[in-house]
């Protein structure tokens, strides 16, 4: 019996991957399945291709606990490129407008207050988010 065959039958648990930029969450999952021959594997949530960060992977019986892991608060760290707008709302899309205006600290802090608490949002068309199993 090879190591890979043994892993497929014996591993039940969690693996937390530091997802690299430009990889989709699904691409990470596919690579793990291919490398270790896992048959039952899933991830919690999803990270957009430009995001770098923790991607919890559930292997084997641990998949039964994904629903208990996903409904918790998350923390995001981000950077901002002031003065441009793109068609995709991120740095990847073509720039559609530019400005030399730079907001001051006070106006940034006031604007950030609008994003505290529960907020209903419509995801952009380019988002990887799914609602009810279909892309939002």
For every predicted segment, state its role.
Residues 1-136:
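Catalytic/RNA-binding core of pseudouridine synthases
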């Amino acid at each position: 019996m090879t190591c890979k065959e043994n892993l497929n039958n014996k591993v039940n648990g969690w693996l937390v991957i530091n997802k690299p930029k430009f990889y989709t969450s699904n691409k990470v999952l596919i690579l793990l399945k291919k490398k270790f021959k896992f048959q039952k594997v899933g991830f919690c949530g999803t990270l957009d291709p430009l995001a770098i960060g923790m991607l919890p992977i559930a292997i084997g019986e641990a998949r039964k606990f994904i629903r208990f892991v996903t409904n918790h608060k998350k923390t995001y760290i981000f950077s901002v490129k002031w003065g441009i707008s793109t068609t995709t709302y991120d740095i990847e899309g073509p720039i559609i407008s530019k400005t030399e205006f730079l907001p001051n600290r006070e106006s940034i802090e006031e604007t950030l207050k609008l994003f505290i608490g529960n907020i209903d949002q419509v995801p952009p068309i380019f988002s990887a988010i799914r609602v009810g199993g279909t892309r939002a």
